[in-house]
Amino acid sequence: MSKRKSPHDFLFREELGHGSYSTVYRVVERSSQHQYAIKICSKRHIIGENKVKYVTIEKNTLNLLGQANHPGIIKLYYTFHDQENLYFVMDLAPGGELLQLLRRQRVFSEAWARHYMCQLVDTVEYIHSMGVIHRDLKPENVLLDKEGRLMIADFGAAYTVGQSDAGSDGDKPATSFVGTAEYVSPELLLENKSYYSSDVWALGCMLYQFLQGTPPFRGQNEMETFEQIVNLDYTWRIPANPLAAGLVSKILVLDPSQRYTLEQIKKHKWFSGVDWNNKEKIWRGSWTIASESTPRPRVGYKSRELLDTPIKNIPVVTQRNKKPTKMNTTSSIVEWRKMLGLSGNDLGIKATLGGNGLPIAPFTPTSGITPDNRGDNAVAPAKTRDAFRPMSSRVISSPHSKPSGRPAALPLPLQTGTPSHNVVQQIVVNTPGRTETSSPYVSPTVPVRNAIWKQDWVQLHEIPYSAKYSGLTLAGFSQVSDTLIADLISHHANELRTLSRTGILSLDNTGYLSFIEQGRARPLSRIIDPDLSIYEYQLGHSTEDDFLILEKYKQSIWIVWPNKPTSASRRIPIKETWAQTLSKYKKQVSDEEELSAKLNRTCVSSWGSRTPSPTYPAEGKTRVAVQPQDIPLPSPAKSSSNSGVSEPISKIPPRQLVSASEQSHKAKSEAHTKKANSYSYIAPNDMVLSSSRYEVLRTASNNDSKSNGAAVSGASAAFRTLRVNK
């Protein structure tokens, strides 16, 4: 008998992905040098998030299904635990997720779609023969081995027939809400029940997705998606083989008793050339049937550093929820059923399950639902069911709905080459007793190689400002602080990832930060906006765990974190974090503006007839003529005896826009004017101007100031790094 495994028996390589309650790594067993995938579940997380049930179900189901070594089931080799984590050692899937392959290909050729459907049908047939309903079939839960063969994974939502949630009453179907919105069966929505036929429904959705590139039912939010499902509201955007479309129409049927069974699917004309008894041919690798239209994708791992560190140092509790959290769909289904007034068996449908996984009592269609009796070649049109139309006028729209996938391609940079200077028109400056026209002002330009400073895939969640909220919440905020930000992210990281949207964050050469989602760019703010503050929060030990927080004063907070791109080349630049890029940009703009200010500064001589040239603020601001007597001279800073660093002189508020005419009313008496004109005012060397409302002026200690007068950069809240050591 082999000894019990432990984390120290494996070398941890790169991270492969995240689930709703786990993190997966590629590992190498030290003794055999065999590669596996290891799923690590934080005990604290699964207990705190009530995931113990899902972890237990997955382990028991994999042990049950692993008895026959079916090629379509991911195999569980070892399970063990330590004080902090649970560990599942499983088959490695070098080909990644089927969803990733589909996104790269956009659509599958008919040959590939048929081949994958054969393997799915054969695997689901085996799963059902073992008395198991998967209940969350989707391309994201289907993995590929190195030869391109499918392996169904993620059995955390599975239900074993004969084992109710209470451990008895084996003749009842599953009655808990699980699954993903776009693949949820209508009987789960309308009856609160899942059958074997519910998995068949998901297969129909997947076949449609193979040929069209997207699921058949996808609304602006989950509520709208549910309405499309119960109305069979889907269309074919791309021409498809009528036989394949006809098969989909036989599977996507509202009545589960009228829906095609797996046996009927196998006998359909679209599979006429398939020998279902020839398992070797069915389970050959998909790369062997690659055609010119669907080239073989590259399989392999990006080279990463070996993680040969103690397991306790691996940040497994950092969840980014690449897969949607099931509880999110659950709450949406509950809300949707409440809106329709559905609960229990309101539709009068018996819940008794027969041996074939279908209800014993035939399903009686509700008003507006008719069985689909069309032929094989017919395509199901969109139906209208007035019985369930309350949703049409009460669809709940969520501005934070998470998109199902990334845009098809990364937008190209807006322009290339070094941008030219921006020349501002001449402006008229009104001064007491005289009017002058200033010379054209050339705004400082940040020297960049391309128009795009940085762009990368991110997840983004926006929190609007509202005085009705106390502090900082996911729904709104009225105040912000380091502590509030740290508490929100550390305690609500999973909710943030569920509510977030996937897109591209882009910073152009003009300093505008934009969020690009589904081909549409939305400007967020200019980096040098005085009302913008920037924070950085690191939840784990990797730069991939960094959260970027952008706060627009009394407007919005944007919480941003990386979403790993499929190719590192899509990052601009590749190695810089967002915090590093923004900090570099602000510093460069500040240096340029300081140099420009020195060049444009005009000293006022004793000639009283001459007016000073106006001082210009940053590009994009209203330019104001400022009299020298209006410029306050800083008082000497008092040095702290303890720290040796001077206290801030003052806190700079947001700049106010003041017209030249209003400024002229502030003119002092003639005596003060003459006195002001008798000397040249130059800003002291130790004054630090800020572009953030949180930045403050600091001066050097008395000793340093006397010795060299060097400027000391102020302590800025614009970039704070909050590191949580777990």
Curated annotation (Swiss-Prot):
GO function term, MF aspect, one: ATP binding
EC number of the protein: 2.7.11.1
Residue segments, region Disordered: 629-679
Basic and acidic residues bias: start-end ranges: 663-673
Pfam families, per the entry: PH_PKH3_C, Pkinase
Active site: D136 (proton acceptor)
Record has Transferase as a keyword: yes
Disulfide pattern: none
Superkingdom, natural source: Eukaryota
Positions that bind ATP: L16, G17, H18, G19, S20, Y21, S22, T23, V24, K39
Catalytic reaction annotation: L-seryl-[protein] + ATP = O-phospho-L-seryl-[protein] + ADP + H(+); L-threonyl-[protein] + ATP = O-phospho-L-threonyl-[protein] + ADP + H(+)
Function, in words: Serine/threonine-protein kinase.
Family of the protein in this entry: Belongs to the protein kinase superfamily. Ser/Thr protein kinase family.
Protein name listed in UniProt: Serine/threonine-protein kinase PKH3
